């Protein structure tokens, strides 16, 4: 199913930790390599933490788990682009071509593979990969957004200005007060408070393609 239905049409697939590594009841890193298309090696020895350090657009952060984890995989693919590294240091820790890469991106003719050795990827990084893959993001603040054809509900996380990015220009009003908040625009800016629920109603419904209305 993955090979026939997912790895095509320009899709991006994000893999976490060690997908496909169980073969015939044991750890087999070649199963992971075949599934993700990214060559990795499995570290030998004792269990240890899995924390990845990332530097993107000048912003440095780490994610993963401090718990002892096994198996531990490290990227060793010269055709892949390393986006994150083992946090413990810049030394080359393992053999077989691995250099400590723990977040790797590799492009194929029909799809893109992104693999993260560490779990617990933060929402900001997930959102970045989703947006690059063509997913429409309504908010970059981490608000919960529940969209439908002519309604949008938002559960707000911050005491700040919400900038809601709409998929297309339209006119929207506050469903509680009937106040028009934006006209013929694909951007809405609204002062919000943490825990507030915003419900928007579109008042220029999308045309029905069957009758042009």
State where each predicted segment sits.
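A conserved amphipathic helix/loop scaffold
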Residues: 1-213
């Amino acid at each position: 199913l993955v090979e026939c239905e997912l790895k095509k049409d320009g899709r991006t697939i994000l893999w976490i930790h060690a997908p496909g590594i169980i073969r015939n009841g044991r750890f087999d890193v070649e199963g992971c390599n075949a599934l993700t298309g990214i060559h990795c090696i499995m570290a030998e020895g004792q269990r240890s933490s899995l924390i990845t350090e990332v530097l993107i657009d000048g912003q440095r952060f780490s994610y993963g788990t401090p718990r002892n984890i096994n198996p531990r995989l490290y990227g060793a693919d010269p055709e892949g682009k390393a986006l994150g590294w083992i946090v413990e240091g810049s030394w080359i820790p393992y053999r077989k071509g691995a250099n400590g890469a723990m977040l790797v991106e590799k492009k194929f003719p029909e799809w893109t593979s992104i693999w993260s050795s560490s779990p617990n990827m933060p929402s900001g990084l997930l959102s970045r990969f989703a947006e690059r893959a063509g997913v429409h993001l309504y908010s970059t603040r981490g608000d919960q957004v529940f969209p439908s054809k002519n309604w949008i509900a938002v559960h707000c996380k911050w005491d700040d200005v919400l900038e809601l990015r709409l998929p297309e220009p339209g006119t929207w009003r506050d469903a509680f007060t009937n106040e028009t908040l934006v006209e013929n625009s694909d951007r809405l800016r609204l002062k919000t408070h943490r825990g507030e629920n915003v419900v928007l109603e579109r008042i220029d419904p999308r045309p029905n393609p069957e009758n042009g209305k």
